[in-house]
Amino acid sequence: MSGPPPPYEEQSSHLYGQPASSQDGNAFIPEDFKYSTVVISCEPIIRQRFMHKVYSLLSCQLLASLSFCYWASVSTSLQNFIMSHIALFYICMVVSLVSCIWLAVSPRPEDYEASVPEPLLTGSSEEPAQEQRRLPWYVLSSYKQKLTLLSIFTLSEAYCLSLVTLAYDKDTVLSALLITTIVVVGVSLTALSERFENVLNSATSIYYWLNWGLWIMIGMGLTALLFGWNTHSSKFNLLYGWLGAILFTAYLFIDTQLIFRKVYPDEEVRCAMMLYLDIVNLFLSILRILANSNDDN
């Protein structure tokens, strides 16, 4: 008589030619979920760990930015360095923009490989097959690459933020930071609640109008810069600040919903960057509002 059948886990691992648990950075993600299933369709433990990774990365980004800004506010030598090397500020702006776009638009390796015809992925020898599977340079194929690019983006943003916050007094900056924290916590908890799941049905149309609002803000800023509008006017700054505060609060709400319901489990770095941008822009808008309110008083 034959012995009892092997356990399901052992049999599955032999069928797929790999152990049941992996040692890589995404070990908690089963292979069938990792590449083709959005987060909302995964098991609860996977959703929880994905949320933990996103907010851990986001917390590190915000802590690094806050620490650098605080260092700049208390260190006279760092203030002198920042003020005497304005060119470095513009370099950091360019680096931040490039790394942000790269993280945002870089295709997933699985999407790129899926677009390659099947005959090209099989060869007569192992070495040609490996050559054919080689991804383009702009595809971030490993977690380490994504994390490195996110670190470069965060450090560049932190340097730019330090120069901006030096232009305001400490009380105004702290007030803006407190208000931003309250708004972010409130919006995030609201967006993650089940009662607002139906908002996703109209997320595409909402994003359309949000993007229009963003382009209006960009147009206002460029017009003021090129044609000499009085950007120091309290009315202009208040209008610009309130428009930005409303716009990026809506962005934060929609992005939080989309991130935990419409993305894949291996996109935590991109998600953290999106939330970080929403929070930073919201903070800058609130800072502008408070600064001009103080000037009027």
From Swiss-Prot:
How does it sit in the bilayer? Multi-pass membrane protein
Q: Which segments sit on the Lumenal face?
A: 1-53, 107-146, 193-208, 261-270
Which Pfam family, an example, fits this chain?
Bax1-I
Q: List where the protein spans the membrane.
A: 54-74, 86-106, 147-167, 172-192, 209-229, 240-260, 271-291
Q: What happens when the gene is disrupted?
A: No effect on autophagy during nitrogen starvation.
Tell me a GO biological process for this protein.
Answer: endoplasmic reticulum unfolded protein response
Keyword vocabulary terms for this entry: Apoptosis, Endoplasmic reticulum, Membrane, Mitochondrion, Transmembrane, Transmembrane helix, Vacuole
Q: Which domain of life is it from?
A: Eukaryota
Cellular-component GO terms for this entry: endoplasmic reticulum; endoplasmic reticulum membrane; fungal-type vacuole; membrane; mitochondrial membrane; mitochondrion; vacuolar membrane
Enumerate the InterPro entries for this protein.
Bax_inhibitor_1-related (IPR006214)
Where in the cell does this protein reside?
Endoplasmic reticulum membrane; Vacuole membrane; Mitochondrion membrane
Q: Does the keyword Plastid apply?
A: no
Similarity field: Belongs to the BI1 family. LFG subfamily.
This chain's function reads: Links the unfolded protein response and programmed cell death and mediates mitochondrial-dependent apoptosis. Induces cell death and disruption of the mitochondrial transmembrane potential via the mitochondrial phosphate carrier MIR1. Dispensible for starvation-induced autophagy.
Q: What is this protein called?
A: Bax inhibitor 1
